Structure formats: structure tokens, C-alpha cells
Regions:
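Extended, folded cores of ATP/NTP-driven motor/assembly subunits in large transport
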Residues: 1-403
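Hydrophobic positions on the alpha1 helix immediately C-terminal to the Walker A/P-loop
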Residues: 451
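Post-Walker A helix-loop "phosphate-sensing" segment adjacent to the P-loop in P-loop NTPases
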Residues: 458-468, 486-487
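A short helix-turn-beta junction within AAA+ P-loop NTPase domains corresponding to the substrate/partner-engaging
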Residues: 485-491, 695-708
Length: 781
């Protein structure tokens, strides 16, 4: 027998004692606050790792992931046993309702909150409803806890590095988190009741097992009853010669509470080589003896029997894997436990799982009279009581790939649809990201406006955050007026209109550094919108000088500075170019766009402000967009000082990058939004125009949240290159239905489906399809 295996079996050897109570069945002797458990004579620690997009990856990417996972398996310590566990946990409805549904507020908007909550409940009911968690548990024999801590500190750092190479995040579980995993399995349906306080436990003299164990355990030859639930432990008895990498995914793609564990015992290479050489020597001896017998019978042309030849060939290949291909010998045990509400359901589910295994030419079998041992083996405790070992190489073990698809289910998140692969809800909390900048991209008719309105509706109904919207197509006013009631104002910007905005308005703290310099940059952008020849160095100097003089006069007189004041100051200057700039600004002061040249006449202090620039026409929209962005920047600065979050939505975002100066100003404003607790969202259908600008491309690539709906062919190619998305993943934005596409959330890429029920008042407010809803502007000002 291999020395490592012999030592392992010796360490695991334990005298059987009849359990006198339910707690005795749980094999954990002691726990420490940092998550280390003592199980028998060994110490164990569990780490949780996140899923990666393996199923939707390209063939090349899958190969890279496979090699990276193989490298992780190769790095496992031969002195320890490693258990990889996939835990399917059903979403608790009570917890779901508490964490996701909107609370009623007793106002006129409760009717919309009920509609939204009902939509979420319907989606959750029709969805998979299973949360899949993945753990890796390392157990090792050490003399004392200090040695164990030192060992796990080193192993933990190694695991985190290797999982990071895969694109997965690996984190340690402390005692409370690990006990919660066990509690949620032993006491299914009572997940919300878990509470563990070590100080309180010691003060009361309780055992930690009291907090997790079921009320009762009953065993029979082929199943267990834990409280009111039935469970059955299976093990992989027979392996196929060739196994697909989708086998584990298919076994766990099951809408039930279940666990699957792979126990791995790595064998040191020198022992493995010695073992295989001995086996090969035995085979060669058998072949030699067989040939000697044939020669004794004068049969000198006899061919070596096929089974002997096959044994020799496989042994040589195995030895070659160990010595030249850096493979390791691994001993593996695969076990799984399925649970059900009654025995009949358990039998039916067992047959379903057995059929999946048969499909892959493997045989799963029920552990007869070993159910308790099997249960303790499959749970992420750190013990192994089943010795149905199968000898594998690193590559053949890596075929049991635990990865499937990334899920985004953040606590306190906002609903963005359901995962197109797992059908679980996608809940995104942008506060968890490195930055909160967002882009919403898609061709006309792909559902951009609807997606933006759905997010705005959630923010208005469920938060107290301010919402500022730049609306070039008169689409958002009705929604804001209906949901905002007294807290919303819709500003109609049109040539000769009564609503005016002061383009020179500037709050205390405006800009990143020098506010006068920032405002000068804004004025240059404004002039450039009129004079397509651009702003030269001489004009820049004049604008900078006059802007400073205007604000000095405003500070002295106590009157707000306006574009009229700036134009008058320009006319006072001796340079001829100053007169030219003044002539350019005439449009905004005494011309048809004087709505930006005087003091503001609108209420900018409301919680929801919609800037409707539809009336400006196509030629003047970029100018209106610039002034509104500057106004929004002032509001974000004020909110930042109050400690309030602001959400900014800017439609037709691409137009501001048609000119150099306006692009520079907008890039600066975008940075300031992020730094001042602003959550900016850019919406555009012209992705190609956006990507032609270096600044806009940089903003897009640096954004942590990007929603991609159906994309044109040329846009797909550019987005794929910019965001490093595979062709397989880009297929989700190719001829996609409205509301379907791909979400880039931090490092995660999740295909999604988002269809809102049409028989609701919210749908009527959000849709832009002719004849289906309210398409136009409300007036809540």
C-alpha cells in the first residue's frame, strides 16, 4: 500500500462509539473563532470560492481555465486531505422577502411598490430558486492549534492566489459562517433562526452543536431522516473511461437542496512513481511468465493477451504522465447527498440523479448501512469516512470541474433581470464595485430606455437618493411625474421657453481644483459648440481672464454671474478676438437660446429633476447637454457636502464627444461625479461614435457596470476587443430580444433576460412602444 494512504488511514482510524444523542453524530470535537475545527485527530479549515463563467467561455478560454484548475490541484499539499464541495441551497422565501421586497410607505406610490414586489415574487417563484455555494476544505494532522494556524495561513494564501488566477475569489470562513453552512443543511427551512454567539454560548454552558443539530436523526439501510426532512448519500462507484467536463454541473443542476463533495488525497510524486513502477514490473513479470509457458508448449508465435497488453500500455502512459507531463497521482472519493420532504420524493430524485450519472457512463450507488459515515464525508467538515478511492491523474480529476456560471446576488442589490443560464435573479449593488460609473448600450428597440426607467423607478420607490435625468427625447417626464408627485420637477428646455438655467451658476466647492479654471473649460466647450473651428490658445486666454473678472464682480456685488455679464466683459476687452467670442455668446444671451444666459427660473432643489431638452432641436441638443451636465455637477457637489447620494442618467451620451473641448469638460465632470458620491449612468445607441473617442472609450473600459443589450455587428467587434469578451459571450448581444443581453459587473460577465409584466401600471409608464403606454412628459414642477 502507498505510504501516504497507509498513514492517512491510520490517522483516520477511530474506535466506534454508539451515539447517545444527536450531537454525537456530528464528528467535530472543538472549534476556534477563526474557523478552524478539530475533527478526530485532525484540524480542518474551510474556504469559500466564487463561480466563474466556464459554461459560456470559448473553447480556448475553457482550456486555459482547465489548465489553471489543474495547476491548483497540483498545488495541493500531499500531507493533507482536500475536499471540494458544491452546496445547492434553496432560497428561503422569508429571507428573500425581507432582503429584496420594497417596504410600503403609506403614500400614493404604494400601488407601484406592490406591482414591483409582485413582479419580483413571480420571478423568484419561476426562477431556479437555488443558491449554489462552493467550498474547499483542507484537513491536516498537526500537533496543536498553533501549528495548524501557521499551516492554514500558508495554505490559505496559496489557495487565494491560485483561485485568483482562475478569476475566482477565495475567502476564509470563520466559525460562525461555517456553522451556518452546517445549520442550513441540518435544519432546512429554519435558516433565518440561526444565531451563534461564542461568548453567550460559553456563559450559558452550551455546546456549539446545540445551535446546528437537527431535532432528531433516524437511520435506515439506505437513507436518513433529519428532523422532518429525508436525505440519502450516494457515492460514485464506477467511472467511465471518458468523462465530459459537464458531469458535475449536470449532477448539481438540480432544483433541490443537495451537496456534492470530491475528497482528494494527493500522493507525493516519488511514492507515486515507485508504486506505478512496481505495478508495471508486476505486469511485465506476468507477461514474461505467460510467454515462458507458451514457449514451453512450443508456441513461439503467440501474441500477448489483449488485457495484459492493455495493462502494460496504461501503466506506461500513467508513468509517462507522472514523469514527463508534471501530472500527480490523486486518490479521489466522490460523494453526494440529496434531500427531500418525503420518502417518495427522495426515491424519485435519487432515480433522476442516477440517470444523469448513467448518461455519462458512470455508476452512482447508494451507501448501504453507511449513511451516517457518508453524510459526514460529504459535508464540508473535514472528515472522510468512505474509502471508495479511485486513482486518477491531475487531468482526469480536473474533469470534475466545479465551475459553472457567475452569479450576481448582492445583499441590498437592485433587480436587473434573471441569469440566462441558471435563471436565478441578478441583484446588483453598485456600492460594492470599485467605481459606480455605468453604461447602458444598445441599438434602437433593444430596451435601453425601458431598462433605464426600470432602474429609475426602483430608485424613486425604494430609496431616498436624488435622481437627476437628462432627457433628450421627452421620455422620462411622465414616469418622474407619476412616481415623484410633489418631489419631482420636469424642466422643459426650449428656445424661447419660460424655463431658464444659469450656465454660469457655481456652488462652493465646484470643480476638482480651481473652480474658475473648471468654469473656463466649460465656457470653452460652449463656444466650441457654436464655432466648429474650435477654440485657439488666444481665445482660451481671453475666456480665462474674463471668467475670473466676472466672478470677482459677482462676489463684490452679491449678484449671481450670468453669460450676459461674461459677454459684456468680453466686449470691454481690447482684443478683436474677444469681440468674436462675445459674438458667439450672443446666441445664449440675447439670441434664441437666452434660456441659458440669465438667472435660473426653475426649482432645482427637488429630489427628482428631469431636464427635458427635446424642444432644443438636434442642432442645439449638444449645447443643452453641456449646460445641464454643469448644472448637475453643482447639484452633486451640494449633495456630497450633505452626505447624500445622487444618481445621474444622461441619454444620447455620445454627442458630447463630437468636439474636443466638450469631451475634456465631460470627462472631468464624470470623474467628479464618481468622487462625490454620484452614480452616473450613460445611455447611448451610437456605440461606434462613442468608441471613436479615446476619452469616451477610456471611460467605458474603466466603468465597472456595463449593460449591453442587442448590438450592431461593428459595435460588437469593438466592444468585444475593448472589454475582452469572448465570441461565445457576445452571442448574447447578437440578435437579442428586447431586454436581453449581457451585464459586465466588476469582473463578472452575466447573460441576462429582463421581461417586465405588461399588465401593470409601471409597464405603461415605462414602455415607449406606440399604443402601449404613456409616452410623453409629465409636469410635476
Amino acid at each position: 500500500m502507498i505510504k501516504t494512504l497507509k498513514n492517512l488511514l491510520k490517522q483516520d482510524k477511530k474506535r466506534y462509539t454508539v451515539p447517545r444523542k444527536v450531537q454525537d453524530v456530528i464528528p467535530v470535537r472543538r472549534i476556534w473563532k477563526d474557523g478552524i475545527f478539530q475533527v478526530g485527530s485532525r484540524f480542518s479549515k474551510t474556504y469559500q470560492f466564487t463561480d466563474i463563467n466556464y459554461l459560456v467561455a470559448s473553447r480556448e478560454d475553457k482550456e486555459q481555465m482547465f489548465l489553471a484548475y489543474s495547476e491548483l490541484l497540483n498545488s495541493l499539499d500531499s500531507g493533507a486531505t482536500t475536499k471540494i464541495t458544491i452546496n445547492n441551497r434553496r432560497l428561503n422565501r422569508a429571507n428573500f422577502e425581507q432582503s429584496i421586497l420594497m417596504p410600503m410607505r403609506g403614500d400614493a406610490c404604494d400601488v407601484y411598490r406592490r406591482e414591483y414586489n409582485q413582479m419580483l415574487l413571480d420571478k423568484a417563484t419561476s426562477a431556479n430558486g437555488i443558491i449554489q455555494e462552493k467550498y474547499i476544505t483542507v484537513s491536516v494532522w498537526k500537533k496543536d492549534i498553533e501549528e495548524a494556524r501557521t499551516y492554514f495561513a500558508r495554505i490559505g494564501a496559496d489557495l487565494i492566489t491560485h483561485f485568483a488566477a482562475l478569476g475566482s475569489k477565495c475567502t476564509e470562513l470563520d466559525a460562525a459562517e461555517k456553522l451556518r453552512v452546517l445549520h442550513d443543511f441540518y435544519r432546512q427551512g429554519e435558516e433565518a433562526a440561526f444565531h451563534f454567539d461564542p461568548q453567550d454560548m460559553m456563559r450559558k454552558g452550551h455546546d456549539f452543536k446545540d445551535y446546528i443539530c437537527p431535532d432528531s436523526m433516524e437511520k435506515s439501510s439506505g437513507c436518513l431522516k433529519l428532523g422532518e426532512k429525508y436525505c440519502r448519500v450516494l457515492f460514485l462507484k464506477d467511472y467511465a473511461s471518458y468523462i465530459k467536463d459537464s458531469m458535475v454541473t449536470e449532477l448539481t443542476d438540480f432544483n433541490r437542496n443537495m451537496m456534492l463533495s470530491i475528497d482528494v488525497v494527493p500522493i507525493p510524486t516519488d511514492e507515486a512513481v515507485r508504486e506505478v513502477e512496481n505495478r508495471l514490473l508486476g505486469i511485465e513479470t506476468n507477461i514474461t511468465n505467460w510467454q515462458r509457458r507458451q514457449n514451453a508448449n512450443n508456441n513461439f508465435s503467440a501474441v500477448v493477451p489483449y488485457d495484459m497488453e492493455l495493462q502494460r500500455k496504461e501503466s506506461k502512459e500513467f508513468l509517462d504522465d507522472l514523469t514527463t507531463r508534471d501530472q500527480r497521482m490523486m486518490l479521489a472519493v466522490i460523494t453526494m447527498v440529496i434531500t427531500a420532504d418525503d420518502k417518495k420524493q427522495l426515491d424519485s430524485d435519487t432515480e433522476t440523479v442516477l440517470a444523469v450519472a448513467r448518461k455519462h457512463m458512470c455508476q452512482l450507488a447508494v451507501l448501504k448501512f453507511q449513511q451516517f459515515d457518508g453524510l459526514n464525508t460529504v459535508l464540508p467538515i473535514g472528515t472522510r469516512r468512505i474509502n471508495a478511492f479511485r486513482t486518477l491523474t491531475t487531468e482526469s480529476l480536473a474533469v470534475f470541474m466545479p465551475f459553472k456560471v457567475q452569479e450576481v446576488q448582492d445583499k441590498g442589490g437592485i433587480y436587473f433581470g434573471e441569469n440566462a443560464i441558471s435563471h436565478n435573479l441578478i441583484m446588483c449593488n453598485k456600492a460594492n464595485l470599485l467605481n459606480q460609473s455605468a453604461f447602458l448600450l444598445g441599438v434602437p428597440g433593444s430596451g435601453k430606455s425601458f431598462s433605464a426607467k426600470e432602474l429609475i423607478a426602483f430608485l424613486i420607490l425604494d430609496t431616498t437618493d436624488d435622481v437627476l435625468i437628462c432627457d433628450p427625447e421627452n421620455e422620462f417626464g411622465a414616469l418622474a411625474a407619476a412616481l415623484g408627485k410633489e418631489t419631482a420637477t420636469v424642466i422643459h428646455m426650449a428656445a424661447g421657453g419660460k424655463d431658464r438655467l444659469n450656465a454660469m451658476y457655481m456652488v462652493d466647492g465646484y470643480g476638482e481644483n480651481n473652480p474658475i479654471v473648471e468654469k473656463s473649460q466649460f465656457i470653452m466647450s460652449l463656444v466650441e459648440q457654436i464655432d466648429k473651428a474650435g477654440v485657439g490658445p488666444q481665445q482660451k486666454s481671453i475666456i480665462d481672464r474674463c471668467t475670473a473678472l466676472v466672478y470677482q464682480d459677482a462676489e463684490r456685488t452679491g449678484k449671481p454671474a450670468t453669460l450676459c455679464d461674461l459677454r459684456n466683459k468680453l466686449l470691454e476687452q481690447p482684443e478683436e478676438k474677444a469681440k468674436e467670442i462675445a459674438l458667439s455668446l450672443e446666441l445664449f444671451t440675447t439670441g434664441s437660446l437666452d434660456i441659458f444666459g440669465h438667472e435660473s427660473t426653475v426649482d432645482l432643489d427637488k429630489r427628482i429633476v428631469v431636464f427635458d431638452i427635446h424642444g432644443l432641436g438636434e442642432q442645439l441638443k449638444p449645447t443643452g447637454l453641456l449646460v445641464i451636465t454643469d448644472t448637475i455637477l453643482n447639484r452633486v457637489t451640494l449633495n456630497w457636502k450633505k452626505g447624500k447620494r445622487t444618481h445621474i442618467f444622461i441619454d444620447e451620451f455620445h454627442v458630447v464627444f463630437e468636439n474636443e473641448q466638450s469631451g475634456i469638460f465631460f470627462n472631468s465632470a464624470w470623474r467628479q461625479f464618481r468622487k462625490r458620491n454620484g452614480y452616473p449612468t450613460a445611455i447611448t445607441q451610437n456605440v461606434e461614435y462613442l468608441l471613436d473617442s479615446v476619452q469616451a472609450s477610456t471611460m467605458l473600459s474603466n466603468s465597472e457596470f456595463v449593460v449591453m443589450l442587442n448590438q450592431a455587428f461593428s459595435d460588437r467587434a469593438k466592444l468585444s476587443k475593448l472589454l475582452n469578451i469572448s465570441d461565445e459571450q457576445m452571442s448574447y448581444v447578437t440578435n437579442a430580444d428586447a431586454g436581453c443581453g449581457l451585464i459586465k459587473y466588476g469582473s463578472a460577465l452575466v447573460p441576462f433576460i429582463n421581461r417586465f409584466p405588461k399588465d401593470t401600471e409601471l409597464y405603461r409608464l415605462m414602455t415607449t412602444r406606440p399604443g402601449e403606454g404613456v409616452f410623453g412628459s409629465g409636469n410635476a414642477s
